[in-house]
Amino acid sequence: MKALHFGAGNIGRGFIGKLLADANVELTFADVNQPLLDALNSRKSYSVRIVGDNTQVEAVSNVSAVHSGSQDAIALIAAADLVTTAVGPQILEKIAGTIAQGLVKRHEDGNTRPLNIIACENMVRGTSQLKQHVLKLLPEAHQEWVVEHVGFVDSAVDRIVPPSEAGSDDVLAVTVETFSEWIVDKTQFCGEPPAIPGMELTDNLMAFVERKLFTLNTGHAITAYLGQQARHQTIRDAILDPKVRAVVKGAMEESGAVLIKRYGFDADKHAAYINKILSRFENPHLHDDVDRVGRQPLRKLSAGDRLIKPLLGTLEYHLPHDNLIIGIAAAMHYRSEQDPQALELAELIRTLGPQATLVQISGLDADSEVVAQAVNVYNAMQ
């Protein structure tokens, strides 16, 4: 089986790329980072350091790389059995052109083997969004053929992969946590789903997407925002602070109550899932910076993301949400000179004030009790 994976960064190499290579898939990475491409093509392998109770280093071999916008990438899409991505939500639209050109070539070449495309991104139904970007760019003459021969398969992914530590002289070395989860919507495949160990199939993807979004992502973000407020540097430092931990755990329990109501999750099992995530945040081998985890606050405060979506669920089911409100207020305080969204957030608050800013970003009702609560908590944090 041949696969092209867009995104040769740490998540691409340390998570999805590793699973594909471990399954003996003929794997090519696509990226725009030339030094990374050169290193992959020269060495054809890299090492993944897996850290937990025991640390081990595993080799990933027989890989190659092409530039994301190249004719080579287009040719690979025309011939591949699987295309995956780990590029970040905002980059999906940028790779849609290459994918569309590859699908046109595939049709013109007469390749009728099923092709499945899976976006492995930190977002809800990312592949469905990628599909819309691709179809917009696809000439009409090819649309029907693509719908018939190409599966766009949504997925939920979960693995903490921090940036490489400063001082590492190996551009390809990557560190990941032991835990990983890749769940895909088995109803969306074209043809039979490939047998890839570590890729789990489900016909109820949204339950798992929201479980991860409302627990791992909600908890991670609130840990980062409260951690920055308390002047902690890493996620581990922050979650070991009893005051931060109490709010983070409380917020995950509030969002968890929504999941239990909406999807019928078992309460005891979900409590264990929350505790597992807290222990992942404490991992002493992962030096995950609060500034990195908190970046892109405008996206994280939008209606469909990790802070507002669980809050809306608590309103829908008339459930408590005090800790989620604290997390939202802390997110509005997030500052980073390196993050354009953080700079934009600060400017919005300066010009509009916190209430109008929150309403504009989140879509919440300006006169709602939750907006008033969030603004009160925000002001108290000054």
Swiss-Prot record:
Ranges in a coiled coil: none
Top-rank EC class of the record's enzyme: oxidoreductase
InterPro entries (alphabetical): 6-PGluconate_DH-like_C_sf (IPR008927), 6PGD_dom2 (IPR013328), Mannitol_1_phos_5_DH (IPR023028), Mannitol_DH (IPR000669), Mannitol_DH_C (IPR013118), Mannitol_DH_CS (IPR023027), Mannitol_DH_N (IPR013131), NAD(P)-bd_dom_sf (IPR036291)
SUPFAM superfamilies named among the record's database cross-references: 6-phosphogluconate dehydrogenase C-terminal domain-like (SSF48179), NAD(P)-binding Rossmann-fold domains (SSF51735)
Annotated gene: mtlD
Residues at which NAD(+) binds: 3-14
Stored Pfam families: Mannitol_dh, Mannitol_dh_C
Protein name: Mannitol-1-phosphate 5-dehydrogenase
Family: Belongs to the mannitol dehydrogenase family.
Gene Ontology biological process: mannitol catabolic process
